């Protein structure tokens, strides 16, 4: 299949860019963007490669994404080696095909076509690309955003190429994301022999009523844009491995995916009040990985919906479900942020794949969005 979007996707997949190793993907993109007049700024932090590229001036539309991928897992279970892209029955297989090298290729090709047709476009077209999204995400988009904000860079609209679609490309657009807050909690007791419980203080027994009450809380009921806040226990550990030792500590890790009905401080206050109610001795460490954000109907959402309706003749759902993305960092700049990408059914799985025709369609959608906002 001869198609610039498919060919570039295959070239990117061949580079095993396990997070945060870019493996040459960004150099490939930069070469293409430089040829059509983009100014490139490398913004590397630590072991992470990032770049910010722009063309033109004025109202700014940025395309954001990541070149890194998750590990392939058991390569023997793949129908083809994960970093050797292959097309079977119209599906392009390879690690990163859907998440998100296909989107990156569609962005670049869309930009090439857009610039060819609008060499003197009125707004500014930009790219914000990182090699650290799948792992810690500490030296990637968040650091670039901080640097851009420090020098008062303008960012009006941002399209993140995360695989938002569920069944056909464009059926779901993410116009926001829930916040994510993790609690690392240690309940302190006194270690001892199980035969002499009066000489010990079992933190598991102590914590059980607290945990029972915690998991039963209805945090909120969501709103028109967000589902209800959820809390899930992710890890729980205690004991020495011996059946005759009362543990001295219990570690519990739980995560909140929260709506705009709450703030992280409100959640923390309620958890601390519950700990005090149950008279527990504890230490706690909180990690806020992202605040909730929402892009209401406006120029960006309207342009995205228009592009999908034009090329796929469907009306997309605007949702805020799912995990976090780098959009949470970009939203801090005051930009309208939307996620539109391919079908996510196989992301992070063995035999990750994407419909090759969908990538061609995605490139046309991206180009139409550019034309509506910065042509």
UniProtKB/Swiss-Prot annotation:
CDD domains: M20_DapE_proteobac (cd03891). SUPFAM superfamilies: Bacterial exopeptidase dimerisation domain, Zn-dependent exopeptidases. Mn(2+)-activated peptidase is inhibited by Mn(2+) at concentration above 1 mM and by increasing concnentrations of Co(2+). There is a competitive inhibitor effect between the substrates. Hydrolysis of Asp-Leu by Mn(2+)-activated DapE is inhibited by SDAP, and hydrolysis of SDAP by Co(2+)-activated DapE is inhibited by Asp-Ser. Keywords: Amino-acid biosynthesis, Cobalt, Diaminopimelate biosynthesis, Dipeptidase, Hydrolase, Lysine biosynthesis, Manganese, Metal-binding, Metalloprotease, Protease, Zinc. It catalyses: N-succinyl-(2S,6S)-2,6-diaminopimelate + H2O = (2S,6S)-2,6-diaminopimelate + succinate. It comes from the Bacteria. It is an enzyme of class 3 (hydrolase). Binds 2 divalent cations per subunit, one with high affinity and the other with lower affinity. Zn(2+) and/or Co(2+) ions are used for desuccinylase activity. The form of DapE active as a peptidase contains Zn(2+) in the high-affinity site and Mn(2+) in the low-affinity site. GO terms for cellular component: cytosol. Zn(+2) is usually found in the tight binding site, but the nature of the second cation in the low affinity binding site is different according the activity. Homodimer. Catalyzes the hydrolysis of N-succinyl-L,L-diaminopimelic acid (SDAP), forming succinate and LL-2,6-diaminopimelate (DAP), an intermediate involved in the bacterial biosynthesis of lysine and meso-diaminopimelic acid, an essential component of bacterial cell walls. Can also hydrolyze all N-terminal Asp dipeptides except Asp-Pro. Asp-Ser is the best substrate, followed by Asp-Gly, Asp-Leu, and Asp-Cys. This is Succinyl-diaminopimelate desuccinylase. It comes from Salmonella typhimurium (strain LT2 / SGSC1412 / ATCC 700720). The gene is dapE.
